[in-house]
Amino acid sequence: MLYFKRDLICDYLYSYGIKYEQNVEDKELKFKYISTVENIDEYFEKLFYLFKIIRIGKSNETPYKIHKSFPSARSFYIQELYISIGKNLYLTLNSKTGKFEKYENTEIGTCKKGTLFIISKKIPVDYYNSIKKSLNLLEIGHILFNISILCDIFKKEIKSIESNNKYIQINIASIEKSRFDLSFNNFQLYCKERTSGPYLKKITNFQKDFNQGVYIPKIKDNDEFAILNKSIPYVKRLILRNNGKDGFDEKNLNISLSYEELNSEYNYIDFRYASQYTMFLLEKSIPSEFLTNNILLIGYLAQEICLFNSRKNFYNRPVKQVVSPNLWNSKFRNLSDKYIPFYAVLSGFYDI
């Protein structure tokens, strides 16, 4: 999937309530079924774990019950992973049966064994037409972070990302030493604990300990990202914290938002009880050719919070409806000329 300036304009106008459909030019790849596969490489098996259903949410808490290792709008989960095993053959996971299957495809062409491909299915119903490409690439960005962590466990890394209107290709390379001290079991625990919190009942934090649910990102803004393919990052991360009195602040930029202002923007969570609001901003001047990878990067950075800030009673909810243009232009004057708010993660602790 490729993202263009027209798509960004559609996304931006949507925040004003103006709806223009993002055009999806993706072409469907044709895979020929070969057979079911019983035993596969452990590394491949762990990669497919990322795409398995980990748990089912409670019906009295959320209408979006399916949970995997990454978030997906309305739990649609439209992404599929294919792994090259050579000679135009690919492994994938049948999400309905839970079995591994082998397919043949002659369209992709020659690629190294172990190359990963993410292919997007169509959203099953007519939702989010104005932001569907945005949501799709953000979701893939979340997946890419998980893949990078899992690769590290197996002494591998993402070398580069290639995008077209059929798939996202992820090229993998071996490394001598893992960067993170993380076992698969611990990674799996983070995945199981990941939640966006209840939707059908009010989230409360009567303790009002707003240090709970806070996450300080380990990834720095100036880190080199293979996901960008050496292009320039046009993304800025902005973290607002609950001051425990009347709203959320970012003291370095002298930004303050009241609970009332934030609750009027997004009323599914009461900001009086939330701890942190991490916003991801995109430069207005970004060249069209860099859009796809920078939006993937935003999803990648958001997943660090969604994954590593996961534990019992913690929630990390991705939010596309960040702040309205009026609030952005009035309260973020130091940033509004250069950036647009593109994505956010709302984090906190909730009482059972």
Regions from the language model: what does each represent?
Residues 1-352:
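N-terminal accessory segments that position/regulate proteins before the catalytic core
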